[in-house]
């Protein structure tokens, strides 16, 4: 195996996206894609030129073959995706919206192949990766997947590798809210970079203000925290620095799903390239804004060449081919209070 830049893990599902608006029960035609926050980030990083290994599990079925084929076409190393002959590949149905509102998503993943991930799925060779990206979704799938998440994050941190963590809360997958909060915060304590949304941070930390939420995670052991503030942008804090970075205005919001994954792609890629945290947030905001202008979870994630042209034009305040406005900073703290 060639040198691995980034290891990511989790569940990739087949996704059937409605081709017309309306209630899913009344939709007659769907377009097949793939979905999964963890693999969205992996794909985004692969498009930027990183060597990304994907650790997962799919069923021995047509949807599983479709998932693996799609990931491999995106450049992911899928040699450690296990084929499960006893459990199916999960899938989801996603509604279509034309007004920028959140789509309705129905999941069919209980008992899926990926829910049977376990510490036994970990291959020593994968632990040589420079960086591990984790989210709160795999630990919500099952006890064995939760054990794997803890072991991967612990071993990578102990080995001196950098670890990023996006809570990506999925309350419906947990037994109760208290368990979710406890386990997600335990995992966050194993990460160097923590990337919650504002509502997630409030629920998990018990604090309202972004600065206090960030301090909560810094006190637990994080080196840096970036809190997503939707269209407003993001607040970041390290042990030495803090600030707001304004969001990137977009003309039309097509699909909000995947914006947070795009943000993670920007943060991880920039930090692994030794950019400052403030510069990483600028890139993250830009990729997140690009994601919401595309129909689909990963379609808006840029290639390296696209980013070189569009992002550089955006931060320079010049008209970019996609029409993005420049990225600024200094939003008022009051804008992020309830």
Language model features by range: what are they?
Residues 45, 197, 260:
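Short, conserved phosphate/pyrophosphate- and ester-handling motifs at nucleotide-, phospho-/glycolipid
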Residues 43, 91-95, 233-236:
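Short beta-strand scaffold segments in enzyme catalytic cores
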């Amino acid at each position: 195996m060639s040198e691995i830049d980034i290891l990511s893990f989790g569940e990739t599902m087949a996704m059937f996206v409605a081709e017309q608006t309306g209630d899913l029960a009344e939709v007659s035609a769907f377009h097949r894609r793939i979905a999964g926050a963890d693999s969205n980030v992996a794909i985004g990083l692969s498009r930027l030129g990183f060597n990304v290994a994907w650790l997962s599990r799919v069923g021995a079925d047509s949807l599983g073959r479709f998932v693996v084929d799609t990931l491999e076409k995106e450049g992911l190393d899928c040699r450690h995706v296990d084929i499960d002959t006893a459990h199916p590949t999960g899938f989801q149905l996603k509604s279509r919206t034309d007004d920028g509102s959140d789509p309705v998503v129905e999941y069919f993943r209980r008992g899926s192949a990926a829910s049977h991930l376990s510490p036994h799925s970990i291959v020593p060779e994968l632990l040589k990766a420079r960086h591990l990206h984790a989210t709160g979704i795999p630990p919500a799938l099952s006890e064995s997947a939760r054990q794997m998440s803890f072991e991967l994050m612990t071993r990578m941190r102990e080995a001196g590798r950098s670890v990023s963590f996006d809570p990506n809360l999925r309350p419906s997958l947990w037994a109760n809210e208290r368990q979710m909060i406890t386990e997600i915060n335990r995992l966050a304590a194993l990460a160097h970079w923590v990337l919650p949304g504002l509502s997630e941070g409030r629920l998990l930390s018990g604090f309202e203000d972004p600065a206090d939420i960030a301090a909560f995670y810094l006190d637990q052991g994080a080196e840096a925290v970036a809190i997503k503030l939707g269209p407003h942008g993001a607040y970041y804090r390290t042990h030495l620095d803090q600030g707001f970075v304004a969001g990137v205005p977009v003309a039309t919001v097509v699909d909000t799903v995947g914006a947070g994954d795009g943000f993670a792609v920007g943060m991880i890629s920039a930090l692994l390239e030794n950019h400052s945290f403030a510069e990483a947030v600028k890139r993250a905001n830009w990729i997140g804004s690009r994601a919401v202008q595309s129909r689909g979870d990963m379609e808006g994630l840029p290639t390296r060449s696209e980013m070189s042209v569009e992002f550089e034009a955006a931060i320079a305040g010049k008209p970019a081919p996609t029409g993005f406005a420049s990225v600024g900073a200094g939003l008022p703290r009051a804008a992020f209070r309830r």
